[in-house]
């Protein structure tokens, strides 16, 4: 399946419909982060940059390291030692 990079947001990349992450951390639910929901209108799935990490999240455990010490899936983020 073809993929493309996820949209950019003010200080990094869109990680989910309401999450924007960059080197300094993540914003969730802000006006800037909510712009990431535009990604849902594109039928081609996007690929988040960052090494793989696992979240203890029942619906989606396959996350990406999107900032120092932060692992995200499309709807939540958590601190993660594997991302340091």
Swiss-Prot record:
Where does this polypeptide localize? Secreted
An example of a Pfam family matching this protein is Hormone_5
UniProt keywords (A-Z) are: Disulfide bond, G-protein coupled receptor impairing toxin, Secreted, Toxin
Top-level taxon: Eukaryota
Gene3D superfamilies registered for this protein in UniProt: Neurohypophysial hormone domain
Could you tell me which InterPro entries the record lists for this protein? Neurhyp_horm (IPR000981), Neurhyp_horm_dom_sf (IPR036387)
Coiled-coil ranges from the UniProt annotation: none
- GO CC terms on record? extracellular space; secretory granule
Q: Does the keyword Disulfide bond apply?
A: yes
Question: Which pairs of Cys residues are joined through disulfide bonds in the record?
Answer: 6-46, 9-20, 14-36, 21-26, 53-71, 65-83, 72-77
Molecular functions (GO terms): neurohypophyseal hormone activity; toxin activity
- Tissue note: Expressed by the venom duct.
Q: What does this protein do?
A: Targets vasopressin-oxytocin related receptors. No effect observed when injected into goldfish or into mice.
Family that this chain belongs to: Belongs to the vasopressin/oxytocin family.
What PANTHER family does this protein map onto?
Answer: ISOTOCIN (PTHR11681:SF5), NEUROPHYSIN (PTHR11681)
Name this protein carries in UniProt: Conophysin-R
Q: Which source organism?
A: Conus radiatus
């Amino acid at each position: 399946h073809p993929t493309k990079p996820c949209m950019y947001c003010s200080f990094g990349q869109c990680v989910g419909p309401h999450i924007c992450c960059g080197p300094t951390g993540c914003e969730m639910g802000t006006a800037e982060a909510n712009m990431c929901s535009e990604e849902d209108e594109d039928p081609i799935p996007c690929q988040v940059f960052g090494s793989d990490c696992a979240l203890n999240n029942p619906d989606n455990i396959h996350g990406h390291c999107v900032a120092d010490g932060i692992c995200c899936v499309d709807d939540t983020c958590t601190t993660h030692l594997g991302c340091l």
